[in-house]
Amino acid sequence: MKALITGASSGIGRDMAKILSKKGYDLVLVARDEEKLQEVKKEIETNTQIIIMDLSVEKNCKKLYEQVKDVDLLINNAGFGTCGDFTKTNLDKEINMINTNITAYHILTKLYLKDMKQKDKGQILNVASIAGFMPGPLMATYYATKAYVVRLSEAIREELKKEKSNVKISILCPGPVDTNFNNVADVEFSIKGLSSKYVAKYAIKKLEKNKFYIVPGFSIKCAKIGAKIAPTGLVSKISYKMQKRKIK
């Protein structure tokens, strides 16, 4: 069995790699930080290939697909966020985020899904966020990218069900997690985040059961339900207050 994990140099990606290695998976780990990837590789027992690559560049996503074939499990995990008033956040950084959080997911999901459907086996885990179920004032672009991942995955899931395919797709939708995401986005969560180890362990456990929505943490499950049943305006107001509190 072979798993391809993007954003594997730290946080959830790193911890999922360790768990899958213990389950016997050979791994292909992708990230931009070679030093951190080498550190992860040292901690893994099974056959591991590391690829240093910036997935915000479209041609690199296609290049990765050409380099790595016969993937049993694809985990799209690379991503980052920005925080601030929409008119004041850096446009270039946001475009880079859209390319990483959306375009890379879209390309890799499409290319590897085609192969998996031909073999009628395989699994894809798209790492989204609870943010994908609600508006996110002061983190507008990030929330929108995660909404794309959620809706794309939901649509693909239905297509696979209608085709009676054995290929499975899932989305991981955590809330705050103690990772480097906070430093990159320049935010500090007002509630304590879950550990990346817990989220990774929970995700793999649910993935093995073919769970589609993987939502770690009771409070985050409640937030997902609340976002669905509450008026959008109310959800936006609550979201705004939460974002305002966590801007450094």
Can you annotate each of these PLM segments?
Residues 77-82:
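Conserved NAD(P)H cofactor-binding loop of Rossmann-fold oxidoreductase domains
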Residues 9-10:
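Conserved glycine-rich cofactor-binding loop
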Residues 171, 188-224:
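C-terminal helical subdomain
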